[in-house]
Curated annotation (Swiss-Prot):
The protein, known as: Small ribosomal subunit protein eS6B
PROSITE patterns (alphabetical): RIBOSOMAL_S6E (PS00578)
Assigned GO CC terms: cytosol; cytosolic small ribosomal subunit
Pfam families: Ribosomal_S6e
Biological classification of the source: Eukaryota, Fungi, Dikarya, Ascomycota, Taphrinomycotina
Primary localisation category: cytoplasm
Function: Component of the ribosome, a large ribonucleoprotein complex responsible for the synthesis of proteins in the cell. The small ribosomal subunit (SSU) binds messenger RNAs (mRNAs) and translates the encoded message by selecting cognate aminoacyl-transfer RNA (tRNA) molecules. The large subunit (LSU) contains the ribosomal catalytic site termed the peptidyl transferase center (PTC), which catalyzes the formation of peptide bonds, thereby polymerizing the amino acids delivered by tRNAs into a polypeptide chain.
Subcellular localization: Cytoplasm
Stated family: Belongs to the eukaryotic ribosomal protein eS6 family.
Residues found modified as Phosphoserine: 148, 235-236
Signal peptide: none
Keyword Cytoplasm on entry: yes
């Protein structure tokens, strides 16, 4: 079985193949999300604590959280479920998924380091991979750099260097477009939008008042016409 070990603190991961089933016995019958000590896996993992995050069986079917079985099942999946991406709105599909209990039929078991042990694992805990992209939303940039509302967020955007594929061209930097950035222009647009809304509401009120007056006038005219007809009919009956 292969162990795909990730270390989220450093952003690294490493695939380790283990042939001895006795070293893997500690993971058997465990469920996804459970924490397992790594002392029995090998001397290099002494003191480490792993969390089981997933895995695949030998045919490539992924483990599904919540299915308390050590074998494969067919589930009706919809949008929002793991292991399925719908192609249309409201589409559902029955797909084969592996239960969340670890067994011998797994080809790869995904683990995350929860607690680091005594010695470093080469290529995993002794290396740090920096994040490729920084925060994009204005509030998250403020939180990341501990800025106040008075500070200009645009000065703190993390730029990344792009190396062009063509030879002889200089590398250049790219920055993401800041989302939800409050500027004088956006405030002006907001004021303009509210002014249009207010103007439209006033216009609707005036038109409604005019229509009510017109309806009252028409009702009064119809009532007057009825009274005239009634009076004419009464006078003709007297004759």
């Amino acid at each position: 079985m292969k162990l795909n070990i990730s270390y989220p603190a450093n952003g690294t991961q490493k695939l380790i193949e283990i042939d001895d089933d006795r070293r893997l016995r500690v993971f058997m019958e465990k469920r996804m999300g459970q924490e397992v000590p790594g002392d029995s896996v090998g001397p290099e993992f002494a003191g480490y604590v792993f969390k089981i995050t997933g895995g695949n069986d030998k045919q490539g079917f992924p483990m599904f959280q919540g299915v308390l079985l050590p074998h494969r099942v067919r589930l009706l999946l919809r949008a929002g479920h793991p292991c399925y991406r719908p192609r249309r709105d409201g589409e559902r599909k029955r797909k084969s998924v592996r239960g969340c209990i670890v067994g011998q039929d797994l080809a790869v078991l995904a683990l995350a380091i929860v607690k680091q042990g005594e010695q470093d694992i080469p290529g995993l805990t002794d290396v740090t991979v920096p994040k490729r992209l920084g925060p994009k939303r204005a509030s998250k940039i403020r939180r990341f750099f501990n800025l106040s509302k008075e500070d200009d967020v645009r000065q703190f955007v993390i730029r990344r260097e792009v190396v062009p594929k063509k030879e002889g061209k200089k590398p250049y930097t790219k920055a993401p477009k800041i989302q939800r950035l409050v500027t004088p222009r956006t405030l002006q647009h907001k004021r303009h939008r509210f002014a249009l809304k207010r103007r439209q509401a006033e216009k609707n009120r005036e038109e409604a008042a005019e229509f009510a007056q017109l309806m009252a006038k028409r009702v009064a005219e119809a009532k007057q016409k009825k009274e005239v007809v009634k009076a004419r009919r009464a006078s003709s009956m007297k004759k």
